[in-house]
A protein has these predicted regions:
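Conserved catalytic or regulatory cores that recognize and/or transform ribose-phosphate-containing ligands
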Residues: 1-100
Length: 100
């Protein structure tokens, strides 16, 4: 079976078009390396009881990470709190960390 990877990217202050543009480039790199890319671009609104949207989406990303062997970190990841946590999790749980 194909190895799976997800993309960790800064999103703050970016619109959907910019986010998806960065994702497409990262996806091409990963597919070229033989990975299947797990989608972690979430657009659904959280349930009304969610009081911290960024934390909700981070939790969803971490759940998706459990399906992956690797995580690709886009440029600027080290200044984005969600990406920093994803990098710590990927490292702690033995996933391959790929830096742009």
């Amino acid at each position: 079976t194909e190895m799976k990877a997800m993309i960790s990217q800064p999103m703050k202050g970016m619109n959907a078009e910019e986010i998806l543009g960065v994702r497409e480039k990262a996806k091409a790199v990963l597919e070229n390396e033989g990975y299947e890319v797990v989608d972690t671009y979430f657009t659904d609104e959280p349930e009304p009881d969610v009081v911290n949207r960024p934390l909700h989406f981070l939790a969803m990303s971490l759940a998706k990470m459990s399906e992956c062997e690797a995580v690709y970190f886009c440029r600027g990841w080290d200044a984005a709190r969600g990406c920093i946590i994803e990098q710590a999790a990927a490292t702690a749980y033995g996933l391959d960390v790929i830096l742009e």
